[in-house]
């Protein structure tokens, strides 16, 4: 059972992880008391990174009285979620799948290349077209890695 809201947890994670050298990618409160935290850093995440963050967060959550049954620390994976403007800037030139809250030109799902992000507007090119999507209109966005064999 959780003691504290998801906003409390997010605030704690956003204050703690950068001091350890990690970026908070996302977190989720899963069934049966599991708290999953997805972290990243330049060069990727190792098992040792996950252990370091787990040990540190366990202590922080104990002090802050945040209860959970299981704490899982993980990398976001190759298809990591994109949530902030900085994510779209960092991954410009890569492919992504974006689902919007409201349709743009009668379409809510876009798969294309991230061209960039300025003034909280993401530019994506697909099928020879370019579309601009306001961050506030993005419901979900994930990198879509290309595998070349």
Curated annotation (Swiss-Prot):
CDD domains: YlxS_C. InterPro entries: Ribosome_maturation_RimP, RimP_C, RimP_C_sf, RimP_N, RimP_N_sf. Disulfide bonds: none annotated. Its main location: cytoplasm. One of its GO terms (cellular component) is cytosol. It comes from the Bacteria. It holds the Pfam family DUF150_C. NCBIfam families: PRK00092.2-1 (NF000929). Required for maturation of 30S ribosomal subunits. HAMAP family: RimP. This is Ribosome maturation factor RimP.
């Amino acid at each position: 059972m959780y003691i504290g809201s998801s906003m409390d947890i997010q605030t704690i994670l956003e204050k703690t992880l950068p001091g350890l050298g990690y970026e908070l990618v996302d977190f989720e409160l899963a069934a049966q008391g599991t708290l999953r935290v997805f972290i990243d850093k330049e060069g990727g995440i190792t098992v040792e990174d996950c252990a370091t963050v787990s040990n540190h967060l366990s202590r922080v959550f104990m002090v802050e009285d945040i209860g959970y049954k299981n704490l899982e620390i993980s990398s976001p994976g190759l298809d990591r979620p994109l949530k902030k403007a900085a994510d779209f800037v960092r991954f410009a030139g890569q492919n992504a799948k974006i689902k919007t809250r409201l349709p743009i030109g009668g379409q809510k799902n876009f798969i294309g290349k991230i061209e960039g992000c300025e003034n909280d507007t993401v530019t994506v090119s697909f099928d020879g077209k370019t579309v601009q999507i306001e961050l506030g209109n993005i419901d979900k966005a994930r990198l879509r890695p290309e595998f070349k064999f």
